[in-house]
């Protein structure tokens, strides 16, 4: 029985964080490096404002991605996986919309047709990895299948399944969510390289690459499959 939800929620989050650190000791180090990159962007764009409708639209999308990036990291450590997948789905749509804007402007087309429409994750607007994730995340967001409810299921003593209102660490699901989070981060970084090159005079990616290279080297030691390609 739950008597004080707030206290038990904090306790469950702490248990999750301890379990992640035990199984993957350098996860916090990886998240810290990702946060360092985000802070680098925040400081770099602190006094920048768009010079037109298109730039302002892009900057708003980028800021939205940054804010959710930091929140997702916290949810993953807490094993709050439904919340993670909903936010990660939103992040994929942001990357797709940024790609759509670039295609429209490069072809000298109006952005008017994009307004009021859900970003298209097809048509090469996101990587295949993100496109595949999006389908799964949409099933969770729309509650169109029952399988995703396993993210908050728990086995009870009488061999039945219940659903917990408290987050619980699962070595498969929590780490899969972390891998998706890192994949999304890399796709965002790739976009930001080209965006900053076009937006910031005399931009150099040296500081960016130092953080990313450190992340990759640390990641290769982490046993996380998302780093297997490096």
Regions found by a protein language model. Name each.
Residues 1-49, 110-230:
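Long, charged low-complexity segments
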Residues 11-13, 44, 58, 67, ...:
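Arginine residue identity/basic-tract feature
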Residues 32-72:
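Short, contiguous, well-structured surface segments enriched in hydrophobic/aromatic residues
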Residues 54, 58, 77-80, 126:
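Residue-level recognition of alpha-helical structural elements
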Residues 61-103:
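Short, hydrophobic, well-ordered secondary-structure elements
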Residues 98-114:
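Long, amphipathic alpha-helical coiled-coil/dimerization segments that form elongated scaffolds
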């Amino acid at each position: 029985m739950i008597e004080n939800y707030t206290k038990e929620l904090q306790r469950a989050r702490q248990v999750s964080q301890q379990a992640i650190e035990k199984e993957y000791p350098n996860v916090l180090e990886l998240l810290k490096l990702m946060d360092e990159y985000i802070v680098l962007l925040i400081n770099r764009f602190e006094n920048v404002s768009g010079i037109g409708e298109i730039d302002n639209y892009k900057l708003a999308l980028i800021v939205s991605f940054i804010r959710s990036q930091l929140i997702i990291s916290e949810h993953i450590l807490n094993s709050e996986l439904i919340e993670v997948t909903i936010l990660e789905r939103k992040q994929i749509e942001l990357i797709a919309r940024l790609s759509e804007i670039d295609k429209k402007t490069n072809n000298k087309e109006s952005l008017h047709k994009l307004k009021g429409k859900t970003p298209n994750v097809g048509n090469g607007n996101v990587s295949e990895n993100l496109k595949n994730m999006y389908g799964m995340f949409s099933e969770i967001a729309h509650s169109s299948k029952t399988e995703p409810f396993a993210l908050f299921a728990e086995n009870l003593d009488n061999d039945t399944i219940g659903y917990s209102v408290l987050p619980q660490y699962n070595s498969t699901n929590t780490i899969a969510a972390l891998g998706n989070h890192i994949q999304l981060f890399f796709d965002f970084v790739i976009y930001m390289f080209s965006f900053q090159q076009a937006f910031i005079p005399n931009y150099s990616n040296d500081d960016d690459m130092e953080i990313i290279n450190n992340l990759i080297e640390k990641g290769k030691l982490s046993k996380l499959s998302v780093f297997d390609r490096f």
